[in-house]
Every structure is written in C-alpha cells, then in structure tokens.
C-alpha cells in the first residue's frame, strides 16, 4: 500500500475513534493503533504532523487536507539516501526512473550533465524528447523525422532559417 493510502486509511479510522493523550500506548487494540503500529517511523511522524503531536487533533480535518493534495500530488526523490532500490551508491537522491530499456521508458535527469533533461520513450515513432539539442537549449521534438507525416518539431534545425521556404506542415508558435 502506498504511503498516501495508508495515511488516508489511518486518518479515516482515526475519524471514527478519538485517540487521546498519546498515540497508541503499548497494548492498545483500536483499529487506529493497529494500523498506526504497522507504519514506519517516518510514516508515523507524517500522521502526527496532520493530527497533532499527541494524536489529539481532528482527524476529519486532517483527512480533508490529505484529500486536497491527493489527486495531483507527486514526490520525486527521498529525504534520505536509500541504497536498497538498486541504485548505485553515489547516485543522486532526486533521480527517478520508471522502467528500464522498455518502449514506455520514462526518465528524469542524468543526461550528460544536463539537469533539465526529460525523455519519454526510446527512439520509436512515439518518441518524445525535451532538451538536449546540440545548438539550441530550447529544443523540443515530438516523434521522429524519418518520413513520418505526423512529425512535429518546435525549434530550428539550422541557423540560416528562411521564412519564405516553409514546408506545407510548417507550425510556429510565437513571433
């Protein structure tokens, strides 16, 4: 279960049971304490941030705060270096990678020292790349050029651009 769902479930359970004084003394058997004891220390601290240090806050209000961030909330990286995720020991904690050499490969960061590099996919027709053009840092490309009528490109491939020699599928945004 993801942390967000665990915390949401915990706060929902806490809304039905009012926990007072301390969060779950040893031997407590409430549903809240059962779920709370399954969380890691970091997750327990996050729950206490929402419902108070002694878990005496209003769990319904805390749950509404959680729901407010839930649909669009994303976290990249970790607060501490974790070496059990298959990363190299000296890797950046803000590095995030989904997949590995698959067609649906998604990577943020780590492209020859360019911190703003973002790549979706590999070099197939639905390839999408932001950044990493040799001459232009504002380069943006959708698709591949090789005889694809759906190719779409933002930016110039050469410096001597001539406005009069536009192709039929020319597309420009801005001046």
From Swiss-Prot:
Residues 22-68, 79-86, 157-165 form a propeptide. GO terms for cellular component: extracellular region. Coiled coil: none annotated. The modification Tyrosine amide is found at residue 76. The modification Phenylalanine amide is found at residues 98, 108, 120, 130, 142, 154, 173. One of its GO terms (molecular function) is neuropeptide receptor binding. May be processed by convertase egl-3. Its main location: secreted. One of its GO terms (biological process) is regulation of muscle contraction. Each flp gene is expressed in a distinct set of neurons. Flp-1 is expressed in the AVA interneurons, the M5 cholinergic pharyngeal motoneurons, and the AIA, AIY, AVE, AVK, RIG and RMG neurons. Residues 1-21 form the signal peptide. Belongs to the FARP (FMRFamide related peptide) family. PANTHER family: FMRFAMIDE-LIKE NEUROPEPTIDES 1 (PTHR20986:SF24), FMRFAMIDE-RELATED PEPTIDES (PTHR20986). Together with flp-18, plays a homeostatic role by acting on the GABAergic neural transmission at neuromuscular junctions to prevent overexcitation of the locomotor circuit. DPNFLRF-amide: Inhibits the activity of dissected pharyngeal myogenic muscle system. This is FMRFamide-like neuropeptides 1. It comes from Caenorhabditis elegans. The lineage of its organism: Eukaryota, Metazoa, Ecdysozoa, Nematoda, Chromadorea.
């Amino acid at each position: 279960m993801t942390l967000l769902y665990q915390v949401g479930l915990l706060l929902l359970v806490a809304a039905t049971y009012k926990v007072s004084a301390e969060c779950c003394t040893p031997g407590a058997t409430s549903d809240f304490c059962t779920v709370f004891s399954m969380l890691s220390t970091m997750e327990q601290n996050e729950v206490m941030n929402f419902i108070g240090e002694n878990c005496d806050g209003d769990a319904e209000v805390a749950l509404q705060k959680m729901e407010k961030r839930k649909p669009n909330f994303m976290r990249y990286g970790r607060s501490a270096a974790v070496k059990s995720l298959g990363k190299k020991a000296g890797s950046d904690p803000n590095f995030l990678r989904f997949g590995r050499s698959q067609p649906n490969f998604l990577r943020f960061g780590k492209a020859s020292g360019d911190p703003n590099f973002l790549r979706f996919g590999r070099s197939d027709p639905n390839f999408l790349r932001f950044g990493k053009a040799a001459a232009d840092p504002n380069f943006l490309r959708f698709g591949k050029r090789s005889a694809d009528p759906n190719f779409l490109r933002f930016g110039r491939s050469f410096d001597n651009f001539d406005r009069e020699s536009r192709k039929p599928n020319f597309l420009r945004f801005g001046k």
